[in-house]
Swiss-Prot record:
Cofactor annotation remark: Binds 1 zinc ion per subunit.
Keyword DNA-binding appears in the UniProt entry: no
Entry EC number(s): 3.4.24.-
Annotated protein name in UniProt: ATP-dependent zinc metalloprotease FTSH 7, chloroplastic
Length: 822
């Protein structure tokens, strides 16, 4: 019972609250002898300092005990150390310790002491935090000596730097606001009282030899009296009124500084001051005083803060020169997708072929043993190539969602930053993280940012940092284990600029082309977006018709189209989204937004109306000759945000087309130049600059027909670009020269002749339909819009002259005449 009482007394003494690790607490507690057979209690006190301090204080007291009892205690203590968070431990609250001691006392004898020792030897569990568990460490002090305080740092050096920075700000603010308060270990500053007196009092004090020190600044004079005189001056009423505003701190000296202003016509009594041995001088204006010093100190504080924020060196107990990311992430912008909105293949439509290519990847990630046991090597990398907006990133997310594995995504531009060597280090960290969480997926978006070819064709100057990053990426991709279960997905829209070493089998084994969707794919994409948004559609909306109107649209374009249609319907306060909303959204995507206030007037309005009618007349004549060609459905002379003053809408064909025949190309050339031809006919040769975009597009089409498509008889089936570059040599060399000046001149002459022939044919078509040109032009000028059946009623009387028929069928008579004339 005596032993239990001693243990209870010791625990009660240990339950005193510990506020801070002061010097008095660092002394070990005195020993307490046990009254029952020499058995003793081991007590551990944990003092957790307030939040913000970076140390944990641990005191342990080890007392002597008999060998047998000591062995039992050590065995039980080891078991307590190995137990989890739910183990019993002695607390610093007095009631719990007293209850435990009382229970031990009832058991009696040595067993009670041993039980108490076992419970008390269990270390307290520190509270967990989001930054990780504090590193509490226990050290056994051999020899049974007196217990010691153990100090363990639980914060990193960077956090300690910020704590010191905050302390510096606090001291700076304290010195600025309360300069009279002394810092620890320094003498308190004397409180200064400034008293303004007349200049006559200053002269009288000089004559009486009462002045100790004078500071002259032009006509402004500050002076202090001698100590015995200053003591008497403290009792004057004007001085007491000046000192009432200053805090009266005990033990803080005060001083009085008198100020006065010297009249400009009176000299300063320097001779009298020299005679009375008065210290005098002028202020040093090279230093800006208190404000300048404060600004300098503030600049230093801000500079230290910036350095601590951006410095990539860790001040922790690890390597002093170890580089790490300033954002506390070794992998740069790499992040694991933890979104609850999981993307699957059901959310991806219009790219069925790409889905099939990626299904095997998904199956491998779900069941890798199925392939590994057969000796099959899974694809180490899959490169997704396609136009912007076709869904490359969405496909990668769908692969991760189907396989239910960690999806680590990053952008290739995040690898290379300011610090040299950071790119390669981040690549290593990224792949190490992926291997640790395998099976997993690494997705590198816009991989061409760091993987451009190193042969000099696609770079202007050398960039060693990017080359190091690329080399590390090549090494990591080629250094996978066969069972690592980590797959790399890369996305780019510039596969031609990638380094050949990256595209070879063994790194990116598969290249999946993600193309723009066809008509059925566009319809599927529209259904997905409509169902996701739960869009209320009108009865006149047929998504197959919308898909037919949007030839060439990508998945991102279609998503934006659905959103624009919903916005237009909401702008009109509609309850449902109608077909007209989708049509307006398509026109906004193609031609821009109609301007409500910028209206054409006068002669410009008439010219633009005839220009658009010229396109419609020539396009209708071409459609009459070529079956299956779409017809003009809408004319408008309302200016749009894209810079177009007029708009001629010709919908795409009802079926997807992948080839363009020579007669269709010639028909498009004539249609593009129909507006310019109408201006020449109506204005008698006084044309405008309104055909700028038409001429640009027609020139591009004619050049490709001559120089790339091989549709010209004089040039023949030759690719002029390949011929001028010296072939398709991968190294960029020129095996047989690039001096092809005569060929370039010939191409230019052929392009010019083709465009001139198309313009002459367009003039013939416009002159053959004067009634439609004038009548429809005047009607469009008045109404600003013509569409639908009303437009078709005007265009049904358009005729196609024989010149158009000859030109579309490839007759070269006019072209040859132009060449002979030149």
């Amino acid at each position: 019972m005596a032993s239990a009482s001693a243990a209870a007394e010791t625990l009660a003494a240990a339950s005193l609250p510990v506020a801070s690790p002061s010097r008095s607490l660092l002394r070990p507690l005195p020993r307490r002898a046990s009254a029952g057979g020499g058995c003793s209690a081991s007590v551990r006190i944990s003092a957790v300092p307030p939040r913000g301090l970076g140390f944990a204080v641990v005191q342990r007291r080890v007392l002597r005990r008999p060998p047998a009892a000591r062995a039992n205690v050590e065995r039980e203590g080891d078991g307590a150390e190995a137990s989890g968070p739910g183990e019993a431990s002695s607390s610093s609250s007095g009631d719990g310790d007293r209850d435990g001691a009382a229970a031990a006392a009832e058991a009696g004898g040595d067993g009670a002491s041993t039980s108490t020792t076992s419970a008390a030897a269990t270390p307290p569990q520190p509270p967990s935090s989001k930054r990780g568990e504090n590193k509490w460490r226990r050290k056994l002090i051999k020899g049974g000596g007196v217990g010691r305080w153990l100090w363990e740092p639980i914060v990193q050096g960077r956090e300690m730097g910020f704590l010191l920075l905050q302390l510096g700000f606090a001291i700076f603010a304290l010195r600025m606001l309360r300069p009279e308060i002394a810092l620890p270990g320094s003498e308190p500053r004397p409180q200064t009282t400034y008293v303004s007196v007349p200049y006559s009092d200053f002269l009288a004090s000089i004559d009486k030899n009462q002045v100790k020190k004078v500071e002259v600044d032009g006509v402004h004079i500050m002076f202090r009296l001698r100590p015995e005189v200053e003591a008497r001056a403290m009792e004057q009423p004007q001085v007491q009124r000046g000192t009432d505003s200053v805090a009266d701190n005990a033990g803080v000296p005060r001083r009085i500084v008198f100020t006065t202003t010297r009249p400009v016509d009176i000299k300063t009594p320097y001779e009298k001051m020299v005679e009375n041995s008065v210290e005098f001088g002028s202020p040093d204006k090279r230093s800006g005083g208190l404000l300048n010093s404060a600004l300098v100190a503030l600049i230093y504080v801000v500079l230290i803060a910036v350095v601590l924020q951006r410095l990539p060196i860790s001040f922790s107990q690890h390597s002093a020169g170890q580089l790490r990311n300033r954002k506390n992430s070794n992998s740069g912008g790499a992040k694991v997708s933890e979104s609850t909105d999981i993307v699957t293949f059901a959310d991806v439509a219009g790219v069925d072929e790409a889905k099939e290519e990626l299904e095997e990847i998904v199956e491998f990630l779900r069941n890798p043993e199925r392939y590994i046991r057969l000796g099959a090597r899974p694809p180490r990398g899959v490169l997704l190539v396609g136009l912007p907006g076709t869904g490359k990133t969405l496909l990668a997310k769908a692969v991760a969602g189907e396989a239910e594995v960690p999806f680590i995504s990053c952008s290739a531009s995040e690898f290379v930053e300011l610090y040299v060597g950071m790119g390669a280090a981040r690549v290593r960290d990224l792949f190490a993280r992926a291997k640790k969480e395998s099976p997993s997926i690494i997705f590198i978006d816009e991989i061409d940012a760091v993987a451009k070819s190193r042969d000099g064709r696609y770079r202007i100057v050398s960039n060693d940092e990017r080359e190091q990053t690329l080399n590390q990426l090549l090494t990591e991709m080629d250094g996978f284990d066969t069972n690592s279960a980590v797959i790399v997905l890369g996305a780019t829209n510039r596969a031609d600029v990638l380094d050949p070493a990256l595209r070879r089998p063994g790194r990116f084994d598969r290249v999946v082309m993600v193309e723009a969707p066809d008509r059925f794919g566009r319809e599927s994409i529209l259904k997905v977006h409509v169902s996701r948004k739960e869009l209320p559609l009108g009865k006149d909306v047929d998504l197959s018709d919308i898909a037919a109107m949007t030839t060439g649209f990508t998945g991102a374009d279609l998503a934006n189209l659905v959103n624009e249609a919903a916005l237009l319907a909401g702008r009109s306060n509609k309850e449902i989204v109608e077909k007209i909303d989708f049509i307006c959204a398509v026109e906004r995507s193609i031609a821009g937004i109609e301007k409500k206030h910028a209206k054409l007037k006068g002669n410009e309005k008439a010219v633009v109306a005839r220009h658009e009618v010229g396109h419609a007349v020539v396009g209708t004549a071409v459609a009459n000759l070529l079956p299956g060609q779409p017809r003009v459905e809408k004319l408008s002379i309302l200016p749009r945000s894209g810079g177009a003053l007029g708009f001629t809408y010709t919908p795409p064909t009802t079926e997807d087309r992948y080839l363009l025949f020579v007669d269709e190309l010639r028909g498009r050339l004539v249609t593009l130049l129909g507006g310019r031809a109408a201006e020449e006919v109506v204005l008698s040769g006084r044309v405008s600059t309104g055909a700028l975009d038409d001429i640009r597009r027609a020139t591009d089409m004619a050049y490709k027909a001559v120089a790339e498509y091989g549709l010209n008889q004089r040039i023949g089936p030759i690719s002029v670009a390949t011929l001028s570059n010296g072939g398709l040599d991968e190294s960029g060399g020129s095996p047989w020269g690039r001096d092809q000046g005569h060929l370039v001149d010939l191409v230019q002459r052929e392009v010019k002749a083709l465009l001139q022939s198309a313009l002459d044919v367009a003039l013939s078509v416009v002159r053959a339909n004067p009634t439609v040109l004038e009548g429809l032009g005047a009607y469009l000028e008045e109404n600003e819009k013509v569409e639908g059946e009303e437009l078709q009623e005007w265009l049904k009387s358009v005729v196609a002259p024989k010149e158009l028929t000859s030109f579309i069928r490839g007759k070269q008579e006019q072209v040859l005449q132009l060449e002979a004339g030149s």
